[in-house]
């Protein structure tokens, strides 16, 4: 049985963002829990006892405390159910939370060599003592089984695959520690319970829905997909920025080439948008954009949403 918990469904900055007065952030401050979103991450487990995180958001401490499944076991002075963290990119909102896991509990960080090179180039991550926190390279199209802290098998297979994307924004115009060529900056993941065969996909950053990507996820029981923006130029139109979604590595939800249209013909049991920006009107429960997304079979999840496969 595969259990999945949405730790955070928001994009960088979350909802409300600390310095933002857009409609989404104003509404979130006014109505509270229904709209609040921390930054994107999910946790999964094959046995309900040992858990793995996909990405470590800057909100990780808050997310762990808000998720009973991830609390230390009763009676233990030092303990965590978290056995590992799998990184799908090197963006701040995917790696900064690692710094909140510096208190000495052992776990493994799984990431592509390009992302591990970013961590190695930033000495602040040395606070994660290598005696306790192992860094394990993963490769595109090479499945692996993340291990429990004692080295035991988890019973879960993880398949990393390349998706259209870009390197972290803070590396734009700078030398990439992991090299300028080759894939690896942006990964999707297929997570499979080796006992039941049930699986889900995690694709929180994707610049384009390609035919190869469609073929990969067709027939899935569950897909978490990039829901950063509703339309490509929404941040520009709202006066919130000067970049399009695609230039930031994110396909829009709407439009002819958007995720809703491009994935409409696939056989997917459950589709959830993740990494939703505060500018995205689909966050607002009464908006026409939310209605359109839900009528197309998509869910806008709240933090704490749990799914069992």
Swiss-Prot record:
Any one of the GO BP annotations: pyrroloquinoline quinone biosynthetic process
Keywords: PQQ biosynthesis, Transport
Superkingdom, natural source: Bacteria
Pathway: Cofactor biosynthesis; pyrroloquinoline quinone biosynthesis
PANTHER family: COENZYME PQQ SYNTHESIS PROTEIN B, HYDROLASE C777.06C-RELATED-RELATED
Described function: May be involved in the transport of PQQ or its precursor to the periplasm.
Family: Belongs to the PqqB family.
Protein name: Coenzyme PQQ synthesis protein B
């Amino acid at each position: 049985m595969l259990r999945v918990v949405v730790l955070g469904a928001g994009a960088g900055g979350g909802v409300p963002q600390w310095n933002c007065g857009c409609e989404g952030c104003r509404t979130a401050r006014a109505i509270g829990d229904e709209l609040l979103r921390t930054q994107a991450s999910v946790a999964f487990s094959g046995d309900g006892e040992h858990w793995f995180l996909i990405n470590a958001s800057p909100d990780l401490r808050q997310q762990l405390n808000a998720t009973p499944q991830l609390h230390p076991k009763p009676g233990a002075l030092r303990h965590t159910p978290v056995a590992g963290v799998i990184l799908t990119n090197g963006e701040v909102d995917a790696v900064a939370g690692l710094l909140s896991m510096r208190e000495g509990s052992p776990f493994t960080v799984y990431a592509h060599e390009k992302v591990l090179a970013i961590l190695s180039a930033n000495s602040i991550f040395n606070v994660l003592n290598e005696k306790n926190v192992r860094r394990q390279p993963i490769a595109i199209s090479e499945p692996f089984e993340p291990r429990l802290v004692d080295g035991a098998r988890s019973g879960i297979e993880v398949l990393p695959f390349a998706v259209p994307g870009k390197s972290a924004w803070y590396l734009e115009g700078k030398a990439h520690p992991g090299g300028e060529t080759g894939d690896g900056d942006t990964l999707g993941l297929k997570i499979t319970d080796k006992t039941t065969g049930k699986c889900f996909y995690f694709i929180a950053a994707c610049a384009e829905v390609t035919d190869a990507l469609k073929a990969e996820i067709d027939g899935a029981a569950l897909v978490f997909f990039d829901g950063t923006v509703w339309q490509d130029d929404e941040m520009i139109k709202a006066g919130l920025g000067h970049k399009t979604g695609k230039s930031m590595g994110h396909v829009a939800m709407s439009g002819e080439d958007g995720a809703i249209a491009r994935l409409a013909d696939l056989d997917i049991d459950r589709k959830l948008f993740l990494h939703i920006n505060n500018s995205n009107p689909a966050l607002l429960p009464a908006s026409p954009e939310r209605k359109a997304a839900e009528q197309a079979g998509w869910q806008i999840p709240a933090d704490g949403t749990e799914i069992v496969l």
